[in-house]
A protein has these predicted regions:
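Hydrophobic alpha-helical transmembrane segments of membrane transport/permease proteins
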Residues: 15-66, 159-180
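An internal, D/E-rich "acidic patch" concept
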Residues: 58-114
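Membrane-water interface segments at the C-terminal ends of transmembrane alpha-helices
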Residues: 22-29, 59, 70, 134-165, ...
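Alpha-helical transmembrane segments of integral membrane proteins
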Residues: 2-4, 13-16, 89-130, 144, ...
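Hydrophobic aliphatic residues
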Residues: 26, 30, 38, 42-43, ...
Length: 315
């Protein structure tokens, strides 16, 4: 088990290094000059070059990458070109919106998908199965930004149950803050819940055809007990894998959803930084998101042995 953990940690470290190179290279390839955007198009060439020197943009590419990557290791993300404040301060302000949003969406998608998958698998081929999987297919097909707009119209404009957008801050109280995150979380969660429900159904159907399930039924165990105690636990490996991947999709989806709902989170910060060519903000925030995704997937890998003890010996 120790060898397995060490191997996974090494793979995670290599992945982080490669991801940092890709992120840095992509941002360098994108058109636009941050110094020119900051000074305006009426600025002279000398003024632009002076600012580029001050910002370190004229240094060799390799040196700039090493300086940036070294700063990441020491949690020194540099200063924003646009806001003229440390990037870490911007992250602290925005992560208190994005992280709860992603966690609420993940909890919602799991709470919806697992019961739907159980229901559908236990009624394979029947009308309930067809209806549930049809709804799941629709959930996968509908774009989350369109679904978000429909939620705003229904619950904010028509029923007036929740705010249409914005975030009051946690200082306004837990319920007002959570209330403002409900619609965005539902918009993020539904497509992921649809995917997870289909995966859970497939895994459960495969497990329900195993010999030990038939043996448990033959011994007289109630079908519900067999389904929840035996089948679900053994079907959790693919479900956990998808959950780890979904966390990445949820973080990426916040870029769209936070702009639809006008939430001051990391997604909106990245979007604004891209339009303003604030390279240091984009690179640093994207790498933080990459690190978060890798950490979550490491936890998923480690949880396999907890869910299925048979894997401990193999690992």
């Amino acid at each position: 088990m120790t060898t397995y953990l060490l191997k996974r940690l090494i793979i995670a470290a290599v992945t982080l290094v490669l991801a940092s190179m890709v992120v840095f290279a992509v941002m360098e390839i994108l058109p636009g000059d941050p110094a020119r955007l900051m000074l305006g198009f009426n600025a002279s060439t000398d003024q632009v070059e002076l600012l580029r020197n001050q910002m370190g943009l004229n240094a060799p590419l390799v040196l700039r990458y090493l300086h940036w990557a070294g700063g990441l290791l020491s949690l020194d993300f540099g200063r924003s070109y646009t806001y003229s404040v440390p990037v870490i301060d911007l992250v602290r302000e925005r992560v208190v919106v994005s992280l709860p949003l992603a966690l609420i969406a993940l909890a919602l998608s799991t709470a919806i998908a697992i019961p739907v998958g159980l229901f559908s698998a236990s009624r394979q081929g029947r009308a309930g199965d067809t209806l549930a999987m049809g709804a799941a297919q629709l959930g996968v097909a509908v774009p989350n930004f369109w679904f978000a707009l429909m939620l705003i119209y229904l619950f904010a404009v028509w029923l007036r149950l929740v705010p249409a957008g914005g975030f009051p801050g946690w200082s306004a109280g837990i319920w007002p803050a959570v209330k403002s995150l409900l619609l965005p979380a539902v918009a993020l969660a539904m497509p992921q819940a649809a995917i997870l429900a289909r995966v859970a159904r497939s895994a459960l159907i495969e497990v329900l055809n195993e010999d030990y399930i038939r043996t448990a039924r033959a011994k007289g165990l109630p079908y519900r007990a067999v389904l929840w105690r035996h089948a679900l636990r053994n079907a959790m490996i693919p479900v956990l894998t998808i959950l780890g991947l979904q966390f990445a999709f949820l973080l990426a989806g916040t870029i769209i959803i936070e702009n639809v709902f006008y939430l001051p989170g990391l997604g909106r910060l990245v979007f604004q930084a891209i339009t303003q060519r604030d390279l240091i903000v984009v690179e640093s925030v994207v790498m933080l998101l990459v690190a978060a995704v890798i950490a979550v997937n490491l936890l998923v890998d480690f949880s396999y042995a907890v869910v299925d003890p048979r894997l401990r010996g193999r690992q």
